[in-house]
């Protein structure tokens, strides 16, 4: 797939099959993330992969609880109160795998650097026929 085609056609996916993502594919996605530029070439990222459904559900539930508790301090979250209160809502949309990018506190702007790595991963996922969603 051509780069421009990938950029123009990638969309956030919120419905997934239950098909497992194999290790080779996950390795390709992480390698794509590692290729992202970073300020001063610090490369302040590390990656985590979770495919355990129960653990992903626990993280989803804990995240929703945290966000609900944060609404008074972060009023922009108010519009999500009903969604986060819904026990059926899974913050990861029941994806078969969760690939996280963690920012190490190094360099001038690690969160922006990790965002670039995440974008590379999402573009690579699309080029491999996989859906992704920025969470």
Regions found by a protein language model. Give the residues of each.
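Small-aliphatic-rich amphipathic alpha-helix that forms the alpha element of a beta-alpha
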Residues: 33, 99, 104-135
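Short, cationic motifs built from Arg/Lys/His that form the positively charged side of catalytic pockets
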Residues: 10-14, 34, 56
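A structural motif
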Residues: 26-34
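Glycine/small-residue-rich phosphate/adenosyl-binding loop
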Residues: 43-114
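Glycine-rich phosphate/pyrophosphate-binding beta-alpha loops
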Residues: 37-41
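Specificity-determining recognition surfaces
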Residues: 1-27
């Amino acid at each position: 797939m051509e780069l421009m085609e990938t950029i123009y056609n990638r969309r956030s996916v919120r419905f997934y099959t239950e098909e497992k993502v194999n290790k080779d594919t996950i390795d390709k996605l992480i390698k794509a993330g590692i290729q992202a530029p970073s300020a001063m070439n610090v490369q302040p990222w590390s990656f985590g992969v979770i495919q355990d459904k129960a653990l992903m559900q626990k993280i989803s539930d804990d995240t929703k609880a945290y966000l609900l508790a944060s609404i008074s301090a972060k009023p922009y979250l108010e519009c999500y109160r009903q969604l986060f209160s819904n026990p059926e809502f899974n913050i990861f949309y029941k994806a078969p795998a969760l690939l996280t990018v963690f920012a190490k506190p190094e360099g001038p702007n690690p969160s922006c650097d990790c965002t670039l790595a995440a974008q590379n991963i999402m573009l690579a996922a699309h080029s491999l026929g996989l859906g992704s969603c920025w969470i």
